[in-house]
């Protein structure tokens, strides 16, 4: 009698060793020793799982080198985006599930996996009055700083001035209300900044549904409104290179419907 095979969903997802082996082989065949080192597994523990993958025609092996079959590659091609998306949400479903994501255009929403493993920053009431120190610190180590914001922070005048003096190029997309605040309460500072080649200010034509999204050469900050549209002091920080590309594309998306501000 031919033994009954497991459903493919169980084969792939019911064992972390099998799932990680498939993902590891996604970019090409690997020697068993490399697989063992990468997965921090013993041969005795891993081989039975590899045999199951072979029995289900997902993996093939020869001379201690293993790779995906055509079926295996097809499935892992679909698996990788899902696993990447799960990694983003896995530890922070409460945050992502209670905050507004409508500001993200569809083509970038489908690529949320590119944010990678972010971390949630929970602030005390005292800390909530400060800008995120990680992004401020790393901006001074960056060539440029990109900000999309719909609210005015009282530290903006001093911090933006310091950044420009350190030759950091600033690109800021904001709302008419924020520009009005700059003009009414901080005219001299922002008039001086606008005369600098390093300070680039844009006003967006519509409501953006964003509290703050900012990135430099090192990290991406997402300070989102709640699902009810309220301001929240807690936020996410992402550090993967892919998250910076994602953040840059989001900035370019909003820049398309923004006009440069050359004078207050």
Describe every region a protein language model picked out.
Residues 63, 216-217:
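Residue-level signal for tight coil/turn positions that link beta-strands
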Residues 28, 150-154, 207:
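Short beta->alpha connector loops
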Residues 135-190:
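Primarily the HKD phosphodiesterase
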Residues 219-264:
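Amphipathic alpha-helical interface segments
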Residues 59, 212-213:
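A structural signal for short hydrophobic beta-strand segments in well-ordered beta-sheet cores
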Residues 83-134:
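Amphipathic alpha-helical dimerization/coiled-coil segments
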Residues 177-211:
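HKD-type phospholipase D/PLD-like phosphodiesterase module
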Residues 1-87:
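Basic, Lys/Arg-rich alpha-helical nucleic-acid-recognition elements, primarily the DNA-binding modules
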